[in-house]
Amino acid sequence: MLPKVLFLMGPTASGKTALALELAENHNCEIISVDSALIYRGMDIGSAKPSIEELARGPHRLIDIRDPSESYSAADFRADALAEIEQIIRMGKTPLLVGGTMMYFKALLEGLSPLPSADDAIRADIQAEADAKGWETLHDQLRDIDPVSAERIHPNDPQRLSRALEVYRISGKSLTELTQTKSAPLPYDVVQFAIAPRERKVLHDLIAQRFRIMLQQGFIGEVTQLKARGDLHLDLPSMRCVGYRQCWQHLDGEFDYDTMVEKAVAATRQLAKRQLTWLRSWPELNWLESGAEGNLVTLMRHCR
């Protein structure tokens, strides 16, 4: 019999952390964070990182493991998560993976293609070429070498377009060709849950309420400190996290406070929409309604 591993997925502000803490207190579980924002040190308020009190109730693995100046890929996450899962199982406990970064869950569950690591020099060349000729021209280049990826990647998505070209220039193979080969899938009995409110308006209200609370907790001060370091910028993955980008732009004088709030809430709602889109097509998923009384009992039943 394969060891059991639990996934608890869901959109932002859906109540994942609260439910995970309840389960950790009532069952022999250890929590592994699956969140591309929580990995960064010093990004606590805007990422809704669990508080000191919450971490005392249920410690989270894979938070505060990178500086905001550093990158962290789905492959990095998969390697780290597999090591944590193995350690938790050796302790006789059940790994509980909690978060909303669906690409991380997918990488862990299905394995990853052997893509080359980022090359800063090639990325700089691609950016310089885009500055000179425009991303439309680079998209035409991608269409010539990888029409399948070009169909999927929009010319106005420079991050993914740049990565597809970078992969080809490093390896001589297209992104489509490389992604046809994947590493081994997860060798465990995985039970997957998703939690979300039944009504979209409820989730939208929760997102707006949570951002207001973040502002009251000192979110602008947090971003001000990050900005003052001098080594961070908006092109870094850490500063592309929702909320942080909009607050940074506000501090740069691009728009006023009210516009910042409006843009940050809108961006977070768009993130939640993308997360739900992923989840609706996810196979073998057990749905829970946010705040429902029977959620803990349902999870504990599957822990046995």
UniProtKB/Swiss-Prot annotation:
Q: What Enzyme Commission number(s) apply to this enzyme?
A: 2.5.1.75
Record's catalysed reaction(s): adenosine(37) in tRNA + dimethylallyl diphosphate = N(6)-dimethylallyladenosine(37) in tRNA + diphosphate
What does the record give as cofactor? Mg(2+)
One annotated GO biological process:
tRNA modification
Annotated site residue numbers, Interaction with substrate tRNA = 101, 123
Keyword RNA-binding appears in the UniProt entry: no
Catalytic EC class: transferase
* Annotated residues for binding of substrate: 12-17
Query: Which residues bind ATP per the record?
Result: 10-17
**Which molecular function GO terms apply here?**
ATP binding; tRNA dimethylallyltransferase activity
Q: Which UniProt keywords apply?
A: ATP-binding, Magnesium, Nucleotide-binding, Transferase, tRNA processing
* UniProt cross-references to Pfam families, sorted A to Z: IPPT
**Which stretches does the entry tag as region Interaction with substrate tRNA?**
35-38, 159-163, 240-245
Q: Which NCBIfam families does UniProt cross-reference here? A: miaA
Matching entries from HAMAP family are given as: IPP_trans
State the protein's purpose.
Catalyzes the transfer of a dimethylallyl group onto the adenine at position 37 in tRNAs that read codons beginning with uridine, leading to the formation of N6-(dimethylallyl)adenosine (i(6)A).
PANTHER family linked to this entry? TRNA DIMETHYLALLYLTRANSFERASE
**What family does the entry list?**
Belongs to the IPP transferase family.
This protein's assembly is summarised as: Monomer.
Q: What is this protein called?
A: tRNA dimethylallyltransferase
Species the sequence originates in: Shewanella sp. (strain W3-18-1)
What is this organism's lineage? Bacteria, Pseudomonadati, Pseudomonadota, Gammaproteobacteria, Alteromonadales
